[in-house]
Amino acid sequence: MIVIDGKKVSLELKNELRERVEALNAKCGKVPGLTVIIVGEDPASQVYVRNKAKSCKEIGMNSTVIELPADTTQEHLLKIINDLNNDDTVHGILVQQPMPKQIDEFTITLAIDPAKDVDGFHPENLGRLVMGHLDKCFVSCTPYGILELLGRYNIETKGKHCVVVGRSNIVGKPMANLMLQKLKESNCTVTICHSATPNITEFTKQADILIAAIGKANFITADMVKAGAVVIDVGINRVDDASAKNGYRLVGDVEYAGVSALASAITPVPGGVGPMTIAMLLKNTVQSFQRVNGL
């Protein structure tokens, strides 16, 4: 059984990106820039934003964080986004979710220039993904990271049955569309399951590649997986654990101990898919810079 090490792959990718940024700087005299906007003081969001800024610095990219109070109006946020859309030094714009209730997330997503939407959430980028124009869009970072893992571990995907459990706009839907593409890392027959799917085990047991992104701790158990399947666990859930220092531990959507005994390859939680998300955000931002500069 292979443990798919996302932490290791993300470090390899960051090293590659650092070398690419150095080469771009030598050629163009400038580097990619990412601006992250955070509205309010959600503790988890603040941690994510700090990690993104740290990762940018590690590969030599410019990084700016705009911190706004929780009572920021939608109009004010839209003005900031418009200014960033017109700033040639900014190649990626990300508004950290969740946002306060007075701000409509879809309106904000629409306001970001699709050419700078390195999160891959804009409908134009999603539409290009569906149509197979991957060279002209940005793919949502978590699905993109999973594709990178499959490729780097040489997982055979062509013609395989991929079952995606979860239908979110951030992971499930783009993941299913990505696995349909005629790529070395995908080209699958795809089934998507969700909370209203009856007898879900009938579908998951057919999966050669099972991607769990449903947001429920230990939802996928050994009796739901066929022997030899490749299992990708997107979930990250807190469960109470009195023996842990913080009183909780992190688990995925897959019951790791049981499923890993059956799987041919599996991602752990933590250390699997999670580290890849920021790495792919960096990759998208570098790609944005290259497109703008015709490279």
Curated annotation (Swiss-Prot):
It catalyses: (6R)-5,10-methylene-5,6,7,8-tetrahydrofolate + NADP(+) = (6R)-5,10-methenyltetrahydrofolate + NADPH; (6R)-5,10-methenyltetrahydrofolate + H2O = (6R)-10-formyltetrahydrofolate + H(+). NADP(+) binds at residues 166-168, 195, 236. The keyword Hydrolase applies. Its EC number is 1.5.1.5, 3.5.4.9. The keyword Transmembrane helix does not apply. The gene is folD. The lineage of its organism: Bacteria, Pseudomonadati, Chlorobiota, Chlorobiia, Chlorobiales. InterPro entries: Aminoacid_DH-like_N_sf, NAD(P)-bd_dom_sf, THF_DH/CycHdrlase, THF_DH/CycHdrlase_cat_dom, THF_DH/CycHdrlase_CS, THF_DH/CycHdrlase_NAD-bd_dom. This is Bifunctional protein FolD. Belongs to the tetrahydrofolate dehydrogenase/cyclohydrolase family. Keywords: Amino-acid biosynthesis, Histidine biosynthesis, Hydrolase, Methionine biosynthesis, Multifunctional enzyme, NADP, One-carbon metabolism, Oxidoreductase, Purine biosynthesis. GO terms for biological process: L-histidine biosynthetic process; methionine biosynthetic process; purine nucleotide biosynthetic process; tetrahydrofolate interconversion. It comes from Chlorobium chlorochromatii (strain CaD3).
